């Protein structure tokens, strides 16, 4: 039976992610901060919620920045929400925070004056929204284009390499909702909270061989 390591650095909705993975039959799901267990896992999930400065402080304290770079190279790897944002170069949150740098680009604030067709939009962006599939990817298997996923975020990803953008969202402005590069896949939304389509994405991740 394959193992899926859910990285625990004290800043994630770990149990809901783990339960969703177990629900789709992903294998033996381990919530862990043990680097040895993470290195030995067949697949790795990197969730995250909260302030990016606090997240990156814990990631660096535990040495997980280098560990994430290592394990995401040679096996299926999934970043979720702030776990996705931590994979970018830098976030402007909290006055500016350097991140892990696996995907080129910046994490930017939606702003206080966000509008759509004359209507003021509340920040954070919270609730269901469509994701446009920019390119075909194994993790989109059996998920229709413009499927709705659940988002909770005040900061969005401005990707520097548009070829890595495999899913796009829109909330007053366009943003990267999903990024992919090799065996790495990352989403701004919460698949574990996104009902049928979110569970399908996790099932696809559990079956994915990491090639793209």
From Swiss-Prot:
UniProt protein name: Imidazole glycerol phosphate synthase subunit HisH
Single GO term (MF): lyase activity
GO biological process, alphabetically ordered: L-histidine biosynthetic process
Source species of the chain: Pseudomonas syringae pv. tomato (strain ATCC BAA-871 / DC3000)
Domain Glutamine amidotransferase type-1: 3-212
EC nos: 4.3.2.10, 3.5.1.2
Coiled-coil intervals, chain numbering: none
InterPro entries given in the database record: Class_I_gatase-like (IPR029062), GATASE (IPR017926), Imidazole-glycPsynth_HisH (IPR010139)
Function: IGPS catalyzes the conversion of PRFAR and glutamine to IGP, AICAR and glutamate. The HisH subunit catalyzes the hydrolysis of glutamine to glutamate and ammonia as part of the synthesis of IGP and AICAR. The resulting ammonia molecule is channeled to the active site of HisF.
Alphabetical list of PANTHER family matching this protein: IMIDAZOLE GLYCEROL PHOSPHATE SYNTHASE SUBUNIT HISH, IMIDAZOLE GLYCEROL PHOSPHATE SYNTHASE SUBUNIT HISH 1
Keywords, in A-Z order: Amino-acid biosynthesis, Cytoplasm, Glutamine amidotransferase, Histidine biosynthesis, Hydrolase, Lyase
Chief subcellular location: cytoplasm
Known pathway: Amino-acid biosynthesis; L-histidine biosynthesis; L-histidine from 5-phospho-alpha-D-ribose 1-diphosphate: step 5/9
Location in the cell: Cytoplasm
Superkingdom: Bacteria
SUBUNIT field: Heterodimer of HisH and HisF.
Annotated catalytic residues: 81 (nucleophile), 190, 192
Record flagged with keyword Hydrolase: yes
SUPFAM superfamilies: Class I glutamine amidotransferase-like
């Amino acid at each position: 039976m394959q193992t899926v390591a859910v990285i625990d650095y004290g800043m994630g909705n770990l149990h809901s992610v783990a339960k969703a993975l177990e629900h789709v039959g992903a294998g033996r799901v381990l919530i862990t901060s043990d680097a040895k267990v993470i290195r030995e896992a067949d697949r790795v999930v990197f969730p995250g919620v909260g302030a990016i400065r606090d997240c990156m402080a814990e990631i660096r304290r535990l040495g997980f920045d280098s560990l994430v770079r290592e394990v995401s190279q040679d096996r299926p790897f999934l970043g979720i929400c702030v776990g996705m944002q931590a994979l970018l170069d830098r976030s402007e949150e909290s006055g500016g925070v350097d991140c892990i740098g696996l995907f080129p680009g910046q994490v930017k604030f939606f702003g206080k004056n966000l509008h759509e067709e004359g209507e003021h939009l509340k920040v954070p962006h919270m609730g269901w929204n469509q994701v446009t599939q920019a390119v075909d990817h194994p993790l989109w298997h059996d998920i229709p284009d413009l499927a709705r996923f659940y988002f909770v975020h005040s900061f969005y990803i401005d990707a520097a390499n548009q070829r890595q953008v495999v899913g796009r969202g829109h909330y007053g402005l366009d943003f990267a909702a999903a990024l992919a590069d090799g065996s790495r896949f990352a989403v701004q939304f919460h698949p574990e909270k996104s009902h049928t389509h979110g569970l399908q994405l996790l099932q696809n991740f559990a079956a994915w061989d990491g090639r793209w």
